[in-house]
Amino acid sequence: MAPVARATPPTRAALRWAATAAATAVLLSGCTPWGAGAESPDQAGAAAPCGNDGNERRMRGAWLTTVRNIDWPSEPGLSAEEQRAELDSYLDAAAGMGLNAVFLHVRPTADAVYASELEPWARYLTGEQGGDPGYDPLEYAVAEAHERGLELHAWFNPYRVGFQDPDVENLVEEHPARQNPEWLVDYGDEAYLDPGEPEVRAWVVGVIMDVVERYDVDGVHFDDFFYPYPKGGEEFDDDASWEEHGGGFDDRGDWRRDNVDRLIADVHEGIERAKPWVSFGISPFGIWRNDSTDPSGSSSAGLQSYDAQYADTRAWIREGTVDYVAPQLYWKRGFETADYEAMADWWSQEVEGTGVDLYIGQAAYRVGEDGWRGEDALSTQLDYSGELAGVDGDVYFSIRSLREQAADAYAVLAGAHYARPALPPRSDASEGQGPLVGAVGGVTARAGDERVDVEWEAVDGARFYAVYRLPADTAGVGSEEARCEAVAAEHLVGVTGRTALTDTAPLEDGAGYVVTALDDYRAEGPVGEVADVRG
């Protein structure tokens, strides 16, 4: 298990100074200085000899939502022990369902589901904003997820402050929006940090980089909330920031898109400088633009995130300021307004040749609704998109839905599409270098009652371990050819952060096991010796 990196967090005053400095730097140079001192670890092992690193790769993730206690905690005010038990249950479920990543909502409304000197504790933990839950949920989640072989991605909402409660007076005294009321824009029954304020952009980048620097997260994630979804013709009142900062633009929409573009680029740059193995991705609304508006848009007729939320996802893909996109394709196949197949095709074409991964946001929460009935409601989606060359996996909203109303549908999906575990996608930042871990040694495999217990020695720099079982006709040969035969998708038994794994599949005589290490970039290390099974 990789330890959680801890460091002394900056003070609020220091962050305010840094925010001002960063805002100036952004305006002058177009980049941020976060994490400039961090470097990649030294290469510790030769390249994996088999040349097939990647053929088991697939994102299988689920969102774990904290806002309004949608998933976790089940209600505010639970004890620390009760919250940890619920979180353990979700992580156990994710691992048991064959998932390999959880996207934990750590900043739902400019507050924190982790120990922060910058923003107050989220109200969804204790029932009161600023209430200390008595432990650090993110620190705990990272450690427990990694032990189970799950990536833990930190999910942030960059601008949202009040969710059905825009009154600044209801925020705790130390909330950044109350300390800086000029940052806040009320909109309907919500409130948002103004994306047009450079200090807001610098603040948000600082908050995110604080988490990246202090926690061993695998990714940083945004969902579909940028400028707010339109509400009955109501205008987002950013006149003040437009007048002060929009001078270089003739069109306010272009200026708003540029504000969001700058945030995306600055976050990506900061992560690359600090921890390049940490992925940064976005799950936008599923429609960029309709082809009736833009001939290069999708064959659809719904809300356009480019125009409604000023989120130019296509630009982020083409400019490489995101590592992946996970568009929310929450529509069934054959839906006239936005057909699932047409939308999957469009996004697949958009990422082609860019190096940006594509994961499909899947609507587990809709199972049971009209058009989403039947045990094949989810599987039929993957029947199509799972065969598209540009699709690298799926993320499900949400983990609670997978356990509850979508449980039967997910079981059918897993049987059809997830018969074997999958390694998480490898970071493109590792291209051009070999894996940073060596071969796994000391592997033993001992047979018991309907089980084989596989154990091995820890490897420096290993984030996860992948365990493979060789078929009987290749085990025991000990040759490089036999070892390479082992590290194939159909032989993967499991992925874990521990140095032991139990295989309960029926054992053939003569089968053996191979264990490989995955580094921070999720690159797979060299293949070691085959361990024969002993009684």
Language-model regions, residue ranges each:
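C-terminal region of N-terminal signal peptides and the immediate post-cleavage residues
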Residues: 28-48
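Active-site-adjacent "subsite" loops/lids of carbohydrate-active enzymes
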Residues: 56-57, 65-85, 154, 159-214, ...
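Catalytic domains of carbohydrate-active enzymes, especially glycoside hydrolases
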Residues: 85-111, 214-219, 321-322
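Aromatic-lined carbohydrate-binding/catalytic grooves of carbohydrate-active enzymes
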Residues: 97-133
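Polysaccharide-binding and catalytic clefts of secreted carbohydrate-active enzymes
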Residues: 107, 148, 178-287, 291-321, ...
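Substrate-binding cleft of secreted/luminal carbohydrate-active enzymes
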Residues: 310-336, 347-433
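Pro/Thr/Ser/Gly-rich low-complexity, intrinsically disordered linker/stalk tracts
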Residues: 408-461, 521-535
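Beta-strand-rich modules
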Residues: 503-525
